[in-house]
Regions:
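Hydrophobic/aromatic-rich alpha-helical bundle segments in the mid-to-C-terminal region
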Residues: 99-104, 137-182
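Short coil/turn segments at alpha/beta junctions that flank glycine-rich nucleotide-binding fingerprints
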Residues: 19-23, 74, 95, 139
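Short amphipathic alpha-helical elements of helix-turn-helix/winged-helix folds
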Residues: 12-16, 91, 158
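Helix-turn-helix
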Residues: 8, 16-50, 54
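Hydrophobic alpha-helical connector segments
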Residues: 54, 68-95, 148, 152-155
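Amphipathic alpha-helical segments used for helix-helix packing
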Residues: 92-113
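Generic hydrophobic, amphipathic alpha-helix propensity
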Residues: 5-13, 30, 55-59, 63, ...
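Amphipathic alpha-helical packing segments from all-alpha helical-bundle domains
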Residues: 64, 111-139, 149-156, 164, ...
Length: 192
């Protein structure tokens, strides 16, 4: 049975991971940042894997909450997609340090479907974008794609990875990075 991580532990876990990286974020360091002891975590059955799963759930919640307004907004698919992609940039910015500190394997465990499942980003992250792509194809403000799920995966990764790189690797402001990735992403999906 998987242990449930007390939500009060997560901010400390994030700090420990951001300070030390996933590989060196021991339970002792996580406990110290969370203001508790390693033994308390141990008694509660909290493992690093349980913490990673709780962080994944937290990120799912963040993305879902950020994309909900674009899903329910009036307007064309293109206008709603722009709103959704801006929201992806905001969430990416809120998690810059965490994403950098996690490393590939833990980050992949959070975001990717198993390779045997088509190699896509997990649907919890991409379904809102896919829905808007379908709506935009229906109202003809966006191109129709043969595989909207795959296109949503491409957009999610294009925005997330490029935005993070421009912010951390090039030192761009959030506004400049958002403007840069959105102009190219939207141009690629807008109908002519």
């Amino acid at each position: 049975m998987a242990s449930v991580v007390d939500p009060r532990i997560l901010p400390g876990a994030r700090r420990a991971i951001e300070l030390h990286g996933w590989q060196d974020a021991t339970l002792e360091r996580i406990a110290a940042e969370a203001g508790t002891s390693r033994m308390t975590l141990h008694r509660r059955g909290i493992t690093r894997e349980a913490i990673l799963a709780a962080l994944a759930t937290s990120l799912e919640d963040q993305y879902r909450d950020a994309l909900w307004p674009a899903l329910t907004a009036p307007g064309t698919g293109r206008a709603r997609l722009e709103q959704a992609l801006e929201a992806l940039c905001v969430v990416a910015d809120e998690n810059l340090a965490l994403m950098a500190a996690l490393g590939d394997r833990p980050r992949d465990a959070i975001f990717h479907e198993p390779p045997g499942d088509g190699g896509l980003t997990r649907a919890t992250f991409t379904e809102p974008v896919e829905r808007i792509l379908r709506d935009g194809a229906a109202d003809e403000s966006l191109r129709a794609f043969e595989d909207p799920a795959e296109t949503a995966t491409v957009l999610f990764n294009l925005i997330g990875w490029t935005y993070r790189h421009l912010r951390t690797g090039h030192g761009w402001t959030p506004e400049r990075a958002t403007r840069g990735v959105l102009s190219i992403a939207l141009e690629g999906v807008t109908s002519s």
